[in-house]
């Protein structure tokens, strides 16, 4: 079972449907309706932290969940969830170079992590006005994808722990290879830690 932390975003259930379509059971909990003990009691095989409005500081249980469970369970952060992963390890979240609400960008990547087998220079939907401050990217994390048009970080992963973040929206119908990226995360959750 995969636990989806809902950050009060309209895209959350698009993610739920995309994951469920791959045969996975998904349990959804709002970021203010579950605590760390509740997460542990559910014993999920993986956690996905959804997009949402605001900043990681306003994302309920998300920062504490990452701080306490990183390395013990695979975690994928999407948009706000991506930012939460960076901030939980000491990264700074800053205003993005450009506000990108419902805009398409070409995404270039290095073929690592979630992008193994994904063609380079694909199109993805972005909905964000905040981004990870690259000089503050925490130790142990690597950038795996960027937006071609503005160079903004579009994906990170941890070199040792199963932690992945994507700033763009893989669940959007307008994102090329979004389903394959989500499938890649699911396949990584099936490996023993």
Please give the residue ranges for each predicted region:
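Phosphate-binding/catalytic loops
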Residues: 5, 121, 165-176
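Acyltransferase
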Residues: 172-193
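Cysteine-nucleophile active-site neighborhood
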Residues: 44-117, 182-183
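Catalytic beta-strand/loop cores that center a nucleophilic Ser/Cys/Thr
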Residues: 113-161
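Short amphipathic alpha-helix with an adjacent loop that forms part of the alpha/beta core around
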Residues: 35-43, 136
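Short hydrophobic/Thr-rich beta-strand motif most characteristic of the beta2 strand and flanking loop
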Residues: 25-31
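Extreme N-terminal starter segment of soluble prokaryotic enzymes
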Residues: 1-3
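Two-component/phosphorelay signaling modules centered on CheY-like receiver
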Residues: 16-25
């Amino acid at each position: 079972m995969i636990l989806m932390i809902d950050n009060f975003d309209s895209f959350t259930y698009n993610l739920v449907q995309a994951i469920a379509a791959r045969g996975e059971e998904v349990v959804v909990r709002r970021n203010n309706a579950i605590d760390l003990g509740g997460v542990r009691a559910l014993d999920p095989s993986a956690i996905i932290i959804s997009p949402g409005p605001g900043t990681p500081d306003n994302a309920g249980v998300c920062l504490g969940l990452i701080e306490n469970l990183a390395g013990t369970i695979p975690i994928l952060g999407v948009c706000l969830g991506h930012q939460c992963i960076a901030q939980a390890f000491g990264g700074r979240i800053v205003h993005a170079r450009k506000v990108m609400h419902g805009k398409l960008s070409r995404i270039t990547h290095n073929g690592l992590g979630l992008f193994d087998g994904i063609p380079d220079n694909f199109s993805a939907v972005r909905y964000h006005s905040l981004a990870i401050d690259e000089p503050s990217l925490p130790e142990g994390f690597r950038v795996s994808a960027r937006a071609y048009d503005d160079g903004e970080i579009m994906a990170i992963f941890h070199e040792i722990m199963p932690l992945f973040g994507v700033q763009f929206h893989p669940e959007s119908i307008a994102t090329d290879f979004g389903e394959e990226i989500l499938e890649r995360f699911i396949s990584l959750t099936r490996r023993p830690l």
